Amino acid sequence: MNPESFAAGERRVSPAYVRQGCEARRAHEHLIRLLLEQGKCPEDGWDESTLELFLHELAVMDSNNFLGNCGVGEREGRVASALVARRHYRFIHGIGRSGDISAVQPKAAGSSLLNKITNSLVLNVIKLAGVHSVASCFVVPMATGMSLTLCFLTLRHKRPKAKYIIWPRIDQKSCFKSMVTAGFEPVVIENVLEGDELRTDLKAVEAKIQELGPEHILCLHSTTACFAPRVPDRLEELAVICANYDIPHVVNNAYGLQSSKCMHLIQQGARVGRIDAFVQSLDKNFMVPVGGAIIAGFNEPFIQDISKMYPGRASASPSLDVLITLLSLGCSGYRKLLKERKEMFVYLSTQLKKLAEAHNERLLQTPHNPISLAMTLKTIDGHHDKAVTQLGSMLFTRQVSGARAVPLGNVQTVSGHTFRGFMSHADNYPCAYLNAAAAIGMKMQDVDLFIKRLDKCLNIVRKEQTRASVVSGADRNKAEDADIEEMALKLDDVLGDVGQGPAL
């Protein structure tokens, strides 16, 4: 309602009441105006009424919501189901144009504004999380793997002779396939074991660059957040190597935005060396549905080149989800979530260590991994190879999701490349182990339930192993008795034959 509408309302309802309602609306509009002027995430989160007012105001700016609109094109924002329209707050046109995912759509001013505001808020939050010198970013409606592929395809035009991507090994399929899908050959650099941790082999990286030739290498593809006992790559050292050899550097920061340590590594890497782009998942860092990622970097023209590489328009759903989430939380709400995640990591580490010791296991020492933990399974794996896999299945059927039981000796072929010791990030890690991670949104009751159910599962597995050992021992005893009996019978036969020798 505009001032004229309020004035008209005063003729029907007491002016004092109408003015009070007008002031209340102005409070909502003030928050919206500040957002549009500053382009920053508000310190305090909005309530739902402000959010819905803002989204409604944006939606009515799109041509499909114009009163009396006559559409005669092939894409006019028509929706058959009213439920689908409500699900998307009537934002039907998506974002971008055929030549650029960040471009403005003439038919969809509201959706275009939503896209611009979302990208601005996300940039603000990346700075809040620790990468203060980030220059540009945009939300792309693809998960991390395909977003990495988009980065590699953009680099293809800048390095036409390149055919290889240097990649310190991490046993996760999508990041490997992202390189293959882009048409490049991943050069896998095995990690080195330092204590319990698997760390970047810097000498091997540099040796491979010299062997292949820098001009034949598209980029170095490094990783921050990962499953223990692997830890984030040595980003500062890798960034220096990339700067020295003039090789682009793309960082897979899938769920690292929630970790101040991972973000500090990226900030420092960009300060001392070269980082061209870093990619993070929306669902892993902002607790929204799967399907979106943020591509960010320190050189605005290069990030714009990546956005122009995206063919066609794109879904606005991931942008809408993260916009609603950030406006609901505000900076203070998101900072609180980051703080709670750190506290949960310490709590999970303490509880898992106690449980490990109670079962004659130990928590692997991985101080450079700020999110994931690992507990040895030596006492289980020593009895039976399948016991580790069985433990993982038991946890899943008892509604424990996210835990990974990693046996020794797994062999997996991904896009033609065979990984030995798959899931453990190394050909021959010393022991089987169980992973658990303290990611954003985890609560204390999640940790308590996990520890309780893991304890029960470990006890069940051990009882079954003990029973199997007893049965196996009994079978061996029976077999030995049968062998003795058989030998006795044969001896009797021999003696009988001797006693029945021919008469003289």
From Swiss-Prot:
Modified residue annotations for N6-(pyridoxal phosphate)lysine: 284
Residue positions binding tRNA: 271, 398, 463
Required cofactor names: pyridoxal 5'-phosphate
Binding-site residues for pyridoxal 5'-phosphate, renumbered to this chain: 75
Spans annotated as Tetramerization: 1-44
Primary location recorded for the protein, binned into one broad class: cytoplasm
GO cellular component terms attached to this protein's record: cytoplasm; nucleus
One annotated GO molecular function: tRNA binding
Functional note: Converts O-phosphoseryl-tRNA(Sec) to selenocysteinyl-tRNA(Sec) required for selenoprotein biosynthesis.
Assembly mode: Homotetramer formed by a catalytic dimer and a non-catalytic dimer serving as a binding platform that orients tRNASec for catalysis. Each tetramer binds the CCA ends of two tRNAs which point to the active sites of the catalytic dimer.
Family as reported in the entry's similarity comment: Belongs to the SepSecS family.
Protein name: O-phosphoseryl-tRNA(Sec) selenium transferase
